[in-house]
């Protein structure tokens, strides 16, 4: 856990937090969530672009995991379908790269510690920074 915190304390941390703060300050926010890859990446990308067009202030993008214990049955099902359809963490990163050509609002990843650790935490957080992810939610880390 300490290693993860250190990785997050790079020079871009303040920029990302300011971007999230600016998107949310002094107002109610529209923050939709989508599981990437359910039913496929192209549909996920199109849905995210529609969310932006319809006023999303920040979008949570779920990176699928095989045992999403913090989720209800609907999002659990979306995770299983996305994984069965061949989604990978790298495909999620690739989609974000494409979206960042058009979208400037904050993106936050929602995933599980196992996804981060199996990718390699240092590489995962470096890649998040590289592609323009503004925050990360790991519900299974206290």
Name every feature range the model reports, one short phrase each:
Residues 39, 58-88:
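Glycine-rich, proline-tolerant flexible connector loops at the mouths of alpha/beta enzymes
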Residues 30-44, 108-120:
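Active-site mouth loops of central-metabolism enzymes
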Residues 84-87, 132-142:
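Catalytic beta/alpha-barrel core
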Residues 32, 51, 62, 128:
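Conserved, mostly hydrophobic/aromatic
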Residues 4-16:
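Short, Lys/Arg-enriched N-terminal segments with co-localized hydrophobic residues
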Residues 15-33, 96-100:
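N-terminal amphipathic alpha-helix/helix-capping segment at the start of soluble metabolic enzymes
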């Amino acid at each position: 856990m300490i290693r993860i915190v250190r990785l997050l304390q790079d020079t871009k941390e303040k920029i990302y937090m300011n971007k999230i703060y600016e998107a949310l300050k002094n107002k109610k926010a529209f923050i939709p969530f989508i599981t990437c890859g359910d039913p496929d990446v192209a549909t996920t990308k199109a849905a995210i672009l529609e969310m932006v067009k319809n006023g999303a202030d920040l979008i949570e993008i779920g990176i699928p995991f095989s045992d999403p214990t913090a989720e209800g049955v609907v999002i659990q099902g979306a995770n299983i379908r996305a994984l069965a359809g061949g989604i990978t963490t790298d495909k999620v990163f690739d989609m974000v790269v494409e979206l960042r050509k058009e979208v400037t609002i904050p993106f936050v990843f929602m995933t599980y510690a196992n996804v981060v650790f199996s990718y390699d935490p240092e590489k995962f957080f470096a890649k998040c920074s590289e592609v323009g992810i503004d925050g990360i939610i790991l519900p299974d880390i206290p």
